[in-house]
């Protein structure tokens, strides 16, 4: 017997792919999501740090502006040539400097002397000049400059977030930086890629604070993450391959057993029921193989029942074609017409004979649509003799449509239903409209009769699916069942009606 290793290999590949591919996609999506969230968080923190730093620097600037404004009048009486006034002035400036949340240096310079707290003689050109004031003292006019070396806030931002700060003037000249990549006095030109920053205005001189970060600094963390993910992926590949191979082997063993049982079933050598070694969904197939023999008997019974049903429908077809009530009523009409109008009676007899010849013709079950419409016209003509020309028939069908074939006697039940259930004391107008599409023939029969109530309409629709012997709507029921037998589920019969507004029957059959 053939081995089924190709299937086993295919199953193993499928299992392996279904295991590894989702994990791989999750890892890729996770990596992309990580960097997307990282960028979003960095933008948020840069915005927050920029706003905090701007607020702090503006508060320092405002504080010294208020201080100098308040002391301006008093300083006009201060003589900085006297040691006592010098000491007092230094104490005032040191007090204001030490109150601020930043490392500040003041530089008070006159024409002959200067004072500062920059005892270490740091390079003030590398500091940010927060404010500059011209102050008139008693002995001379001095220039007061307040420099910022750094702030705890900027140090924490650089230490914890890796974000650096720049202060530039209106010409993008660097005034302050805590990053070695930029120098005081050079033009600020941010990199085009991998560089996040945000800028806010600091003062009326159009100086701007810029907080920025180079996201390339996170490459090392990203590489470490990729290495970890790569190791995990390799382990998953190894584990997934081994697991897929074992699972494919188990499943293929059950399938091979099922194939053997199918082969035995073909040769009618299948014994008693034997379950598979491993319980799985394949057990349903195994059960089906054994149930197949029992279902064969049920299938034979179903075929016999269907054949009986077809014979019943054929009997009803013969019964309907003879139309005993229609024949009886027509014969009474002829009997009534013979003494009064022999010519009319002769015409009715000729029409009736043609109708009987048409309905009893058994050479074919299909006819041209033109023949069926001619039969309908004769049928309505006889009914008009009975009902004093109270029925008006209109046929809307092109010549090309009339050459299409249709099942014999498949339109008459629709017209008969319109006359039987739609006629009242007013003239009855029946319109037959036939349209041809690419694959279907659409037949619409509309009357302006009394129509049906919603409950009656629902009852008629339900009766289409009843047994041919269990419904009073024999004509429509028979038509529906015959169409289902002849055309299958492609045939459709829809009924629409409103009380006192007429009835519309839509009949759809596929082209033969």
UniProtKB/Swiss-Prot annotation:
Its main location: membrane. The chain crosses the membrane at residues 20-40, 222-242. Residues 297-512 form the Histidine kinase domain. Its EC number is 2.7.13.3. It catalyses: ATP + protein L-histidine = ADP + protein N-phospho-L-histidine. One of its GO terms (molecular function) is phosphorelay sensor kinase activity. GO terms for cellular component: plasma membrane. InterPro entries: Bact_2-comp_sensor_kinase (IPR050640), HATPase_C_sf (IPR036890), Sig_transdc_His_kin_internal (IPR010559). Autophosphorylated. It is found in: Cell membrane. It is a multi-pass membrane protein. Gene3D superfamilies: Histidine kinase-like ATPase, C-terminal domain (3.30.565.10). The modification Phosphohistidine is found at residue 325. Keywords: ATP-binding, Cell membrane, Kinase, Membrane, Nucleotide-binding, Phosphoprotein, Transferase, Transmembrane, Transmembrane helix, Two-component regulatory system. SUPFAM superfamilies: ATPase domain of HSP90 chaperone/DNA topoisomerase II/histidine kinase. Probable member of the two-component regulatory system SE_0166/SE_0165. May activate SE_0165 by phosphorylation. This is Uncharacterized sensor-like histidine kinase SE_0166. It comes from Staphylococcus epidermidis (strain ATCC 12228 / FDA PCI 1200). The lineage of its organism: Bacteria, Bacillati, Bacillota, Bacilli, Bacillales.
